[in-house]
UniProtKB/Swiss-Prot annotation:
Topological domains annotated Cytoplasmic: 54-65, 131-150, 228-254, 307-318
Its membrane topology: Multi-pass membrane protein
Organism: Mus musculus
Descriptive protein name: Vomeronasal type-1 receptor 45
Residues carrying a glycan: 175
Lineage: Eukaryota, Metazoa, Chordata, Craniata, Vertebrata
Family label: Belongs to the G-protein coupled receptor 1 family.
Length: 318
């Protein structure tokens, strides 16, 4: 999704903040945003706890359990961090210094990158699981899960390096009034980057998002083709029912497909809101709508996963 919240060359407020424009005066916007964050924290906490208990009790783990558990942990940390940052956006200036501003924005940036990466990995893994034995992807079915940890560590280091410029560009908002600062929160601002640095950073972000989203789209299309082919084969087998394993795989695949579709739609919506702020309107209301849209995926995704877990569904029904 768009990284415009903290890392765009566009200022988050195109005007100097004053008493009439600060977001903490918009109580409805503030309450809606914190409700979204609260629901997301609750859902991701429950999903993460479910997978931890599943591991401790020695239940048989599926290949997708690790990336799903990791995704819930990433989203939980990201939403908790955003809730803390939002107090400096919607409520009042907390007077953070340079170190706190750099740490919060840098960590948030890395978590957003890992969310995108883990979602892409989950989509690819589900495509590998669903692939038939005759497929070349089937050979990766038992190798891919063992390389997930290495991939996570590698990508974490990579994102930390890509985002390292934030440690230089983020500063505490000075008391002096200057028009060249780009506001992140009431306490934190971004120093303007040179054209070369801005172009290089934007290119790296674009390449990363295009690559990972392309992986998601290709794996999603591949799974759709496999499901359609499997359905046609099942229609020719009169009186033959699907095995429980096949049915479970199909349910898991449909969940991943729904989640990937939702992710892509939210990415498109996020880009539309971002472009509208850049080209037409950039006031506190449009800004708050943007950060609300940015966290819809992290809020909704745990409930999508939990809807397919029989144990959780039975507990909720009981």
């Amino acid at each position: 999704m768009s990284e415009i919240l903290f890392f765009s060359p566009q200022p988050l407020f195109s005007h100097m903040m004053n008493k009439n424009s600060r977001l903490h005066t918009h109580s409805n916007i503030k309450n809606t945003f914190f409700s979204e964050i609260g629901i997301g924290i609750l859902g991701n906490s429950f999903l993460l706890l479910f997978h931890i208990l599943k591991f401790i009790r020695g239940h048989r783990l599926r290949l997708t359990d690790l990336p799903i558990g990791l995704l819930s942990l990433i989203h939980l940390l990201m939403l908790l961090l955003m809730a803390f940052i939002a107090t400096d956006i919607f409520i009042s200036r907390r007077g953070w210094d340079d170190i706190i501003c750099k740490f919060l924005v840098y960590l948030y940036r890395v978590l957003r990158g890992l969310s995108l990466c883990t979602t892409s990995m989950l989509s690819v893994l589900q495509a590998i699981i669903l692939s038939p034995r005759s497929s070349c992807l089937a050979k990766l079915k038992h190798k891919y899960p063992h390389h997930i940890s290495c991939a996570i560590i590698f990508l974490s280091v990579l994102y930390m390096l890509i985002s390292s410029h934030i440690l230089l560009s983020i500063i505490a908002t000075p008391n002096l009034t200057r028009n060249d600062f780009l506001y992140v929160t009431q306490s934190c601002s971004i120093l303007p980057l040179s054209y070369v640095m801005q172009s290089m950073y934007s290119t790296l972000l674009a390449l990363r998002e295009v690559f990972l989203i392309s992986l998601m789209v290709l794996s999603t299309l591949y799974m759709v083709v496999l499901l359609c082919r499997h359905r046609k084969q099942a229609q020719h087998l009169q009186g033959t029912s699907l095995s429980p394993k096949a049915s479970a795989e199909q349910r898991a695949t449909q969940t991943i497909l729904m989640l990937m579709t939702f992710f892509v739609l939210m990415s498109i919506f996020d880009s539309i809101v971002s472009c509208s702020r850049t080209m037409f309107l950039d006031d506190p209301t449009s800004y708050s709508i943007h950060i609300f849209v940015m966290h819809i995926y992290a809020t909704v995704s745990p409930f999508v996963f939990m809807s397919t877990e029989k144990h959780i569904v039975n507990i909720l029904r009981g």
